[in-house]
Amino acid sequence: LDGYPCIFQDDYKAAVNLTEQMVKTGKKFGYITVTDKDEAVGRQRKSGVEKVLGENQITLESECVKCGNFTLESGYEKAKELFTEHPDVDTLICATDTMAVGAANWLKENGYQIPQQVQIAGMGDSFLGKIIEPKLTTVHFFYKTSGMESAKVLVDLIESKETSSVHKEIKMGCKVVLRESHRNI
C-alpha cells in the first residue's frame, strides 16, 4: 500500500534462485502453483520460475503447470494429474513446501524415485520439508528477521512525529536450501 511501511518477502527472487539450481540437473519441468489472484505466491513465484526456464531455453508447457490451493492434498492431486499426463517430467517445483510434500507423497506411492527420477523442490522451508524422506529442497525466507524489522518500523512510527522519516519498504532476502530431493545432494 502506498504511503504505508511494508516489510515483505521477495517471492520473485526466491523462485529465480531456486529455479537456477534446479535447471542445472533438470530437463523437463512441471510446476504446481496457486491462483494468480495471489500476487506473491501465485504470480511472483511463477514469473521467477518462467524467467529462469526461458533464459535456459527450457519450455514450461502450459499443460505442465497445475494450479492448487496450498494444501498437502492439493499437491498430491496436482502431482497425480501432472504425472499421469506427463510421466516424462523430471523436475517438479512447487509454490509452497506443503504442496511439494503432498506431491512427493504421490510420487513415492507411485514408485517414482526422488531425486533419481524426479527432483522436487518447494518454497518456505517448512518443518514438514525437513522431516520427510528425502528431505525437501526449498527456499528459506527470513521470517524471524521480518518480524524484528516490522517491530523496529513500528517503534519508529510510534516515536517519530514525521512518518516520512520511517523507511517505507523493506524487501527481505532469502536463501536456497539444497537437500536430498535435489539431484546434486
Regions found by a protein language model. Give the residues of each.
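Flexible loop/turn connectors
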Residues: 3, 10, 14, 25, ...
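Surface-exposed cleft-lining segments at the edges of enzyme active sites
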Residues: 4-6, 32
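Alpha-helix N-cap and loop-to-helix initiation/capping positions
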Residues: 6-10, 41-44
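Alpha-helical elements of Rossmann-like donor-binding domains used by nucleotide-donor carbohydrate transfer enzymes
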Residues: 17, 21, 44-51, 74-81, ...
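An alpha-beta-alpha
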Residues: 18-58, 63, 166-183
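Small/polar loops that bind or transfer phosphate-bearing groups
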Residues: 33, 41, 67, 95, ...
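Alpha-helix N-cap/loop-to-helix initiation residues
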Residues: 38-39, 71-72, 100
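Short beta->alpha junction loops
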Residues: 64-73
